[in-house]
Every structure is written in C-alpha cells, then in structure tokens.
Amino acid sequence: MTASATRNDLMIVNLGPQHPSMHGVLRLIVTLDGEDVIDCEPILGYLHRGMEKIAENRTIIQYLPYVTRWDYLATMFTEAITVNAPEQLGNIQVPKRASYIRVIMLELSRIASHLLWLGPFLADIGAQTPFFYIFRERELIYDLFEAATGMRMMHNYFRIGGVAADLPHGWIDKCLDFCDFFLTRVTEYQKLITRNPIFLERVEGVGIIGGAEAINWGLSGPMLRASGIQWDLRKVDHYESYDEFDWGVQWQKEGDSLARYLVRISEMTESIKIIQQALEGIPGGPYENLEIRRFDKVRDPEWNDFDYRFISKKPSPTFELSKQELYVRVEAPKGELGIFLIGDRGVFPWRWKIRPPGFINLQILPQLVKRMKLADIMTILGSIDIIMGEVDR
C-alpha cells in the first residue's frame, strides 16, 4: 500500500469501557485523523440498573439505600433530594437543628466529591502526586461521616423530616479542627498545581464553552459557573438554611478546563466557610420531626400509647404520597440534581424521574473534543466530572 493511499485514512479507536481515564464504564468511539479528533460517540448504559423503575416499587424509606448508588461519591445529595421531594409534597417542616446538620453533611460531601475529582483529573493529565494527597484529606471527611452516620460511604442518614441520628458528643469540635486543617491543604494544592506550567499547558484554552452555549446545552454546576454564569441553586432556591450563612457563588468567565478547575477549588474553600458558620451557630432542639406520624393512616394518635412511645419514633414506611406532581432540585457537586415526582395517594411513587447532572453535562463532550488532539479528550472529560452510576442510573 502506498503512502498516498493511507494518508487520508481515518482510524477508529475505542476508549473504554475499562480504561481508567473513563471514570467508570464509559465507552467512547473516537474517529481520528492522525492525532486530530474528527468525531466522538459516547456509548452509555453499561451501569444501568433500572433505578427509576425500582423507585416505583418501593416506599421512600425503603428506597433511600438505593439512591446512594447513583453518585456514590456524593451520597448525601442523593439522599437529600429523595427526602426533600416528599417533604414538599406533604408540607413537612424540618427542625432548624436538622436543617443545619443537613447543610454540614452536604458541604462535607461536596468537598469529598471535589477532592476525588481533583486527584484522578490531575492523574489523567500526568500529575500523580496530588492523587495521593487528596486521599489524605478525604479520609478525614469519611472519619467524620463514620462517627456521625455509622458509614463511611452510602450513609443512609437523611430521613423525611430530619436526619436519622443527632451528632455525637465531640463531633462538632472535631469538624471545626478539620476545617482549620483543610484550609491549609487547599493552599498547598494551589501552590502545587495552579501555576504549574505543565498543568497550565494541558488545561488552558482546552474545552472552551461560552455562557450562552452552556445554557443552551442545559449545563449546570461548575460547568455552567466556569462559563461566566453565576447560577447556584443554593442561592436561587433558598433550600435548607443556606440563606442564613455568608458565602459567595464561585465563578470564572473563561469557560475552559482551567476555569472549571478554579471554580471547584474555590468551592471547597466556600464550603468550609459554610460549615464553620453552621457549626458555630447550630441551634438546639430535635433532629427529626416526629409530627410526621400524623401523615400515617391514623390521623389522631394517642401521644402516650404504646405504639407511639416505643415503636413509631421513626417515620413510618407507610408514608403516603398525595396526588400531586412536583420537581425538586439541589445543587450537587456536579450540577443540578433533580427529581420529578408524581404521587398517587399511595405509599409508592407513580413516577420517579431522575435528572442527573453528569448525564446532561456529558452531552456536550462530542462537540468539545472535535478538532482537538487525542490527549485532550482525557483533559476535557476529566474537567466535566462524571460518575457513571449517576449517568446510567
């Protein structure tokens, strides 16, 4: 075969589903002209487990352990959205102490998720050292989770009307110590990474998304805020107790992979600010709204009867969903995590539609990698931050 015959031949390369840079079981069919990417087709579904259909055959309390398997690196957010939806359907009030505890857990989970994005992202583009550093801090967060919930991952901690258990003795002091320590670690990350010339060469100007383009594609989270759009659901939807704390929306206007890195690094610092304020101002009172027992079939319980005092201290699995529909969302580490819930006067949801941020954000990947080099696929995909358990559901 002559050289002229092969010069214009395109090559098709399969990346994944086992390749470590695919962050799970994502498969990309990439068409190359030399080193230049001509086309990229993501193949999904390798981790599909029918999560939406399972929800239609479980009560909310029975379904809670399943939801932590969507985004298994930020499980507090999947739990939060699962209990927020029936709380809004039933107009259930969450005690102030429980709301503060939720905020603390959510922000710790956000930091843990961003840390486990940072390490593999840098490993993908050739920097191995931070990959080991981030696990050092992440272990401290998991120790806090274990002390409060009994589980390092898959916590099963949130409940309709509050949380499963109060914070143990000494936990608040340990968490404050972690916050002070972690701020010094973030400074270390920035010294090590942010101005590293090799890192900047790999990420600056790579995978640029404009603000209007990000909105048109339905992007959310750091992907959207790195394109100059100051949109954060914690500010927009005023859920939990976020309005009571002093913090700012972190954003950049460049829209490239470096901007997405800077947004996430800044978000970790802001999360620490929120956690510190919540720990210092956490009120007393109950950690769970026991009044939600009235949503059971017995409308007027005897407050001193045997069932209430010794059995029904926790939300009943027979919590009924009224005949309504609503969309509930939270600001997860990867973007807008939403649930479209339809109740049908039964204990099971009639429809439970999940809006995963990773799945929506992944849509733009084929457009971003076109006319880029093959090595830039790892940079761009890493900067999107996906978890396949959430993408495939």
Swiss-Prot record:
Q: Name one GO cellular component term.
A: chloroplast thylakoid membrane
Q: Which residues form a coiled coil?
A: none
Q: Which reaction does it catalyse?
A: a plastoquinone + NADH + (n+1) H(+)(in) = a plastoquinol + NAD(+) + n H(+)(out); a plastoquinone + NADPH + (n+1) H(+)(in) = a plastoquinol + NADP(+) + n H(+)(out)
Please give the chief subcellular localization of this protein. Answer: plastid
Gene Ontology MF annotations? NAD binding; oxidoreductase activity, acting on NAD(P)H, quinone or similar compound as acceptor; quinone binding
What compartments host this protein?
Plastid, Chloroplast thylakoid membrane
Pfam families (alphabetical): Complex1_49kDa
* Similarity comment text for this entry: Belongs to the complex I 49 kDa subunit family.
Instruction: Give the multimer and partner information.
Output: NDH is composed of at least 16 different subunits, 5 of which are encoded in the nucleus.
Q: What is this protein called?
A: NAD(P)H-quinone oxidoreductase subunit H, chloroplastic
Q: Which organism is it from?
A: Panax ginseng
